[in-house]
């Protein structure tokens, strides 16, 4: 039973939206933002439900890529114990090093988002027109990079320079809603010539520390968040996390299956359709978001 007024349908839709869109290159923030606003989630409700859905999708990714995650964790210990000039690093240590190099940029972007730029800028970037425009624009950029990028580079070819560039691209996604963090990092990796499977895999792996930080930040913010209208409870959060886990795991499997067989074009076309739909319904959506 779903307590305190929140319907199971509300919880189910928010969780499925987050789970399906977090790892696909189609902007989870735009989808969750619109879904939350349409359902009237505010204050503590929104913080709790978003933190729970983020946690569910994070666990899904960690489980799906458990071998890579395990190798990276062991590689991190290897990095700490191995002087720079000593023996060659294992594949796990090289992966851990690239993740470490790529991760901070999203956190830097979050600091900028929260504390530096004026509120008027964030209001403008959060408008339906800005979200629609970035959804279409960065979809076109993914299309270009996917068509231009080769398929000659794989996991073993990842350099610190490449990790730096892929990581730096996350700044755009953090600052501009609708960009898609996973989408922009896959775009950067494809532009650098990494094969599609590798681009998708690395984009998701470097998202793990970021999503963990976002989830923790959201949970820490529960105490100070104003009460929401529906009275979301911890039980609601657990339901959302479980559903987001299932849908997130399924979406990762779908993505990895598709990129092994075809290009990113289906996601590009979806972004175009979403952007056009947002613009077409802008009087209604603008009122909901604004």
Task: Pin down the residues of each PLM region.
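Multi-pass membrane proteins that catalyze or facilitate reactions on polyprenyl-/lipid-phosphate substrates
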Residues: 1-290
